[in-house]
Amino acid sequence: MLFNINEKGEPLVISFAPFLSPEAIKHLQENERCSDQSQKRTAQQIEAIYTSGQNILVSASAGSGKTFVMVERILDKILRGVSIDRLFISTFTVKAATELRERIENKLYSQIAQTTDFQMKVYLTEQLQSLCQADIGTMDAFAQKVVSRYGYSIGISSQFRIMQDKAEQDVLKQEVFSKLFSEFMNQKEAPVFRALVKNFSGNCKDTSAFRELVYTCYSFSQSTENPKIWLQENFLSAAKTYQRLEDIPDHDIELLLLAMQDTANQLRDVTDMEDYGQLTKAGSRSAKYTKHLTIIEKLSDWVRDFKCLYGKAGLDRLIRDVTGLIPSGNDVTVSKVKYPVFKTLHQKLKQFRHLETILMYQKDCFPLLEQLQDFVLAFSEAYLAVKIQESAFEFSDIAHFAIKILEENTDIRQSYQQHYHEVMVDEYQDNNHMQERLLTLLSNGHNRFMVGDIKQSIYRFRQADPQIFNQKFRDYQKKTEQGKVILLKENFRSQSEVLNVSNAVFSHLMDESVGDVLYDEQHQLIAGSHAQTVPYLDRRAQLLLYNSDKDDGNAPSDSEGISFSEVTIVAKEIIKLHNDKGVPFEDITLLVSSRTRNDIISHTFNQYGIPIVTDGGQQNYLKSVEVMVMLDTLRTINNPRNDYALVALLRSPMFAFDEDDLARIALQKDNELDKDCLYDKIQRAVIGRGAYPELIHDTLLGKLNVFLKTLKSWRRYAKLGSLYDLILENFHERFYFDFVASQAKAEQAQANLYALALRANQFEKSGYKGLYRFIKMIDKVLETQNDLADVEVATPKQAVNLMTIHKSKGLQFPYVFILNCDKRFSMTDIHKSFILNRQHGIGIKYLADIKGLLGETTLNSVKVSMETLPYQLNKQELRLATLSEEMRLLYVAMTRAEKKVYFIGKASKSKSQEITDPKKLGKLLPLALREQLLTFQDWLLAIADIFSTEDLYFDVRFIEDSDLTQESVGRLQTPQLLNPDDLKDNRQSETIARALDMLEAVSQLNANYEAAIHLPTVRTPSQLKATYEPLLEPIGVDIIEKSSRSLSDFTLPHFSKKAKVEASHIGSALHQLMQVLPLSKPINQQTLLDALRGIDSNEEVKTALDLKKIESFFCDTSLGQFFQTYQKHLYREAPFAILKLDPISQEEYVLRGIIDAYFLFDDHIVLVDYKTDKYKQPIELKKRYQQQLELYAEALTQTYKLPVTKRYLVLMGGGKPEIVEV
């Protein structure tokens, strides 16, 4: 029950319905199932919307309507008396928050329109007003609110700013690192610190590798709940724990034993093949068979009796025994077919080889790790201190401040917990541990609502941890008192062809080991409607592979990315879709794993005339030509003796010096000086005192004088003005901004130049001043091989979309092409010199000196890089985590498609036909095989090979060069402009025929367009009505004339000395008033008088307006109340322009006008027009203005592609306002 106050100050009591019990929810589910609605909510959706009083985890598969569920749940909470500001709603992006807010707003407007309860209308209107203040946004945005409000409690000023520019962060980091590095090099433990630096950088002069290590450790720690505690307690966890063979995790031993047993099984399967050759011609066992049987028996025995024969302490001995047993090669050949039986086992043995030696030297690296721990802790504290001094922080800092505020201030934490009725989280699978801690502090322990899908967790590079979701999933399934799991499996997005291939692929690929979740019946996609199950044979998924057997070298290697041939395959399929099926370009989307080869795709599509829009490429802003020219201009202004920058400026279009000019200048040196800069030579050339003054001709001298004069002016400006003004001065004085407008990609180039000025302005506003510091900042960004974000420009809508898989998340497209499926997964991180893990801490490659072990006496040292045990442990986990993320990326990419999905890659047809595995083992691909395959394409081919007897819902097709010729690819069909059959019969001579045609054309034009000669090309509805009304509506004219003559009232003459107010002026004033009138306030005389002051009319006209009549319209008519209820949908005094065809001349003309008011809804439009004409009967004005409203309706329909369902005239010329529907 809720109490509100009405306008009279009286309490309004609203009785809200209680939350539904489990029995009521079941009843609602049954009613929904039996209803005849075309679109029904699923039982699980209803459960997710209405279940309350406990923690809820909604596992929502792709396309299952999770946003719909969230919006409906929020609306249900509001309708049951929970104010919107008592809900905490976290989204992953700002865009998602905006969309969610808009959906809630639309739902509230719809609910207001449906309800007849006035008190409920008032309450819902209040919720609308509170919506903009509600906590709907990202975790970063909420953390900023907390710190802005309560930062004082931990000593943080509320007047902070966010450092979003990575370049600024890098500059500060570099300053802190350099100072700290010097301190550590001069401390007592300097020898240990030098050894630490050398272990990663090779020498103490080049600190880049060590700096990267420190920065990475710092960034990793920032994603934890408490960075300082993690660095102190977890950073060296594995280094302290794993120091003996007995410390090796059981899981790693199990994987080794599993690889041994799998090898024995695969070898047995191979030896059982008919063509293997177990026996010799004499009938005895062959030597090969005997050897392989021995391997099978020993591997099986060692696995079975591992604990008795070896145990963990004897692991090193087991590795030696297995290494000596199996052959050094990977393959066993049968009938010229190679089977990689030993490949996986060799990889596992490599992991465990030299364990005793590694453990012997591993203890020597522990002092180095302690030094690293101290350095990273000191760096974290010093960097934070600098940011506090600057009052500028990163998002992670703000989040940790918010956590600290809530942890250390019980009253603040409890106030939040008591305030929030529910803590709701979208995209829960992408949370990190810092965010999870913040959510835990906001919740009261039983009011969390989490929506996500672990199969779509693809942000590990942002330290997102899918195990947070996974752990909740397991806990809630085992311990129902902690919370409830609800599965949304129905997919409402894709046709069965997409759903079937997705289920087929991931049921063979994804489990807890790789993918972090078993893709079983719980997680498989189910069509949500009957329409999705209708089969389309031409929409079966396709794996299209360019056959690289005869690759002519045009294709780059895997590391380089996609080849021209692969893109041509895509172009061919798109041309076929567009020409044969009429598929518009905007229905087609290309997905890539990275943007590195977008240029090849765009270039190829341009060749075939296919329009394409990309979501950006690599960040190359600072490397764009126009920006480099301007940066060199600024460098020259700062220091003219910078020869590189000066030459670039002289050669630029601003001054246009050519090679000959520069050569002549270069010869003007001073023989007495050993080193002479170009700027000095220019000055000597101008005054004629160079070594060869005769080389400076008049034209060159004039160019030099102009240059020196301009440079002097710029340098003076740099001392007096801001960076922003200086850059704009550079643009315009030498017309460079105008010059780039004439070049290719002019719009992008001009946007880049203007963005440079804006970034300089932002740089100065952040507290830095001066041209020198700005150039230094830019140079540091370039030194760190970073760049600034590219500038976005407007893109065409009717074009194929090209974007990364990450960017496509949450979107859907009819046709999806997944490109570059042959691209190897990036395993760069597992080959670095260090690997971080949240639980185990850091593992490193240690550069050990094994001089003593080898007995070497000649050399000073013998350094060998060793993978320490913590490193190997982290490496294995990271490898599986990387493969899992790639698998989820493939899932996201495939489930974006509505109708059809294509996989594009390249492979050798002959090699791909080799059998991957001799035997199908269970439903999943063997774990060892999934670990071994490192491309989407390899996974798909392995599934197609091993499970070839199943219908996998995708076809594999190899494309040859002969399929990619110009004729085979085809070209886009364009509408034919001329029909050859319509050409004039050529029976007469060409001259006579042309003369007759000209005479006929002139006569026809004069006849057809006679009316157009006397009519304007731009007309208004009033002009149109006056011109054609007698022709189009003669009956209506007669009625009006008769009715006007039958009026019996006679108005007495008015003899006032005041000037008469024209009716048109009153009408204009009424329209102005209706435009500016604030509808959010109650409409009364005071509101009208306040609004009246703001219109542009004289006092006589304002006095002539009947405000009581206007008040009556809003208070006493349903249409007036409609204005106030749906004010968010209202557009007032909207201009329009449409093309019309003149009925007499058949010539097109522009019709312009202004629509008084219209309401724009999702599926229809309501049109309103005010009239102040005097009338006797409303039917008169209805007939008079019917055509005018039809024109307005036509304009709105053309603009929005929606029907105008209602058209109203508001008549203000009578005794009271009247509403007439036309």
UniProtKB/Swiss-Prot annotation:
Residues 524-810 form the UvrD-like helicase C-terminal domain. InterPro entries: AddA (IPR014152), DNA_helicase_UvrD-like_C (IPR014017), DNA_helicase_UvrD/REP (IPR000212), P-loop_NTPase (IPR027417), PDDEXK-like_dom_sf (IPR011604), PDDEXK_AddAB-type (IPR038726), Restrct_endonuc-II-like (IPR011335), UvrD-like_ATP-bd (IPR014016). ATP binds at A60, S61, A62, G63, S64, G65, K66, T67. GO terms for molecular function: 3'-5' DNA helicase activity; 3'-5' exonuclease activity; ATP binding; ATP hydrolysis activity; double-stranded DNA binding. Heterodimer of AddA and AddB/RexB. Belongs to the helicase family. AddA subfamily. The heterodimer acts as both an ATP-dependent DNA helicase and an ATP-dependent, dual-direction single-stranded exonuclease. Recognizes the chi site generating a DNA molecule suitable for the initiation of homologous recombination. The AddA nuclease domain is required for chi fragment generation; this subunit has the helicase and 3' -> 5' nuclease activities. This is ATP-dependent helicase/nuclease subunit A. It comes from Streptococcus pyogenes serotype M49 (strain NZ131). The gene is addA.
